[in-house]
Amino acid sequence: MLRWTTAGESHGQALIATVEHMPAGVPVTKDEVSYQLARRRLGYGRGARMKFEQDALTFLTGIRHGLTLGSPISIMIGNTEWDKWTTIMSSDALDMEDPDNVAAMSSGRGAKLTRPRPGHADYAGMLKYGFDDARNVLERSSARETAARVAAATVARSFLRETLGVEVLSHVISIGASEPYVGAEPTFADIQAIDDSPVRAFGKDAEKSMIAEIEAAKKAGDTLGGIVEVIVEGLPIGLGSHISGEDRLDAQIAAALMGIQAIKGVEIGDGFEEARRRGSEAHDEVFLDDNGVYRNTNRAGGLEGGMTNGETLRVRAGMKPISTVPRALKTIDMENGKAATGIHQRSDVCAVPAAGVVAEAMVTLVLARAVLQKFGGDSLSETKSNIDTYLKNIEERMKFEGLEDGA
């Protein structure tokens, strides 16, 4: 089974992405990984850190001459600001008799962080793990970790492209209380136009409304969340399964998206709006003509019974406002219990555009895993052969002899 993990801290020496059980022969380039990481840094309302957060890439294992080997793949993303953090984030014990260490750890970025931010992992993490310094929590809980997920997903993107010819895209539906995008569904041909938008919007009216929201929040010393949508065209019927809850593809996608920092809700297709409809208005009727099976609607978002049904996969995720609010929120000091305001780290007003790219990454990884679960293969060519056989069987199954015109 395809498996991915990440390691590293926000201000540590590096982040590591590991991908296991990817078939041999999948093309991967540093340029493509760098391109996807750059997309993650996009967005109106990003903080100053994005100017520093360049991504120094190293392919450590599992790739030779631009192709995967079938062995574990590990990708390292170096921290270009590491020289500023070598003492503070040192993995070795510090000699606190050394005046330089004392100075580094007693003020500025090295000072102990004892005022947990409401909405962040600080408070629960300090208590759960017995830490007296919130840095031990926030370094790993930071959304900087998602850079490693995007790197891992770039390998999965190539796998999906090579095996199924599909691409994964996202766009921002709304930010804060902006007017949500309502209009034609974008296709992958629109991805450059979406990325060229400062808020990754597909529609100028929605873009203007989102930018206005961000400007207002910035002036008010506040932060914003929003809604992103991920779209995937061309998936075959039958990825996932109805057999058990954990095998349902919608459950896997929802879990992966909810695992992104600050994501608070997920809906497939029309999602919660479906709950307001009657059954006769909620489901996508099936028709057959000379060109094959078709539907006039896609309210299910491409998933029925935990399986892809051949329609476009459509998923939305809701991101809460960033927890590091410039006008710091009320909290308590964990050192003495006194009333305080939350610690302030360099952060963004709005990271919703970037969240769309991360959501793409997680959907990509889940889909790649589903493809390998369904079709297997130790090499790319073997997986493609298995897919071709399956698709031919589906095509044969859907040929109906003696069907009268209009039947």
Swiss-Prot record:
It catalyses: 5-O-(1-carboxyvinyl)-3-phosphoshikimate = chorismate + phosphate. Reduced FMN (FMNH(2)). GO terms for cellular component: cytosol. This reaction introduces a second double bond into the aromatic ring system. Belongs to the chorismate synthase family. NCBIfam families: aroC (TIGR00033), PRK05382.1 (NF003793). This is Chorismate synthase. The gene is aroC.
